[in-house]
């Protein structure tokens, strides 16, 4: 029987240049989230590396990588669903920004980022994900023991129709591993995560890396849990940490009945 009250944990990681250290840190934070009673845990976008397109080809994995087995086994051992942020996935000659989802000891699905982060804010930030990644092309839900969920990645959040389509497919929870920059974060981060929760009438969970001023690309942090009214349940600051809150999915039905916009 599906439970309506669920404890969710977002792991705002300090990202290290070393792949293995990041994996170890992710596992440690997942274990700590389990100790807090979390049943679903999420990692940030590209949690295995600093966000730098020059590094991505070197750290790419496929769905046969030992990392997949590690998280599959961890989901079974800790009795949790793991939304494993995103990694660089290699498929043939192509690279994708991909989120893998694990539950009950197995990989239950993956989502490839659809809208790639190609921006040029003069004098502030220029970034072109499409120089490395191919876009995904399917916005779909995943069936879990907690009901249907939707997954989007970072820049996807700027497209309300995509998030609304997941809600229309039955998702009550939207998971968004992300890494808004220190330029776009203060402008739009809270505004966007609240807006997507409001216009999809879903819980939105947005998980970022912690701020690290040593890197050329500096993530904004501020991982957040937002309810279907668009109200921030809780939000972290710049530093690493685990945001853990219990949510009640009954609120989704309540909001959708009160204000029927879907």
Which residues does each predicted region cover?
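Hydrophobic residues at beta-strand termini and immediately following loops
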Residues: 11, 59, 111, 142, ...
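Short beta-strand scaffold segments in enzyme catalytic cores
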Residues: 84-86, 98-101, 140-142, 223-225, ...
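Active-site catalytic loop in hydrolytic enzyme cores
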Residues: 90-169, 182-191, 257-261
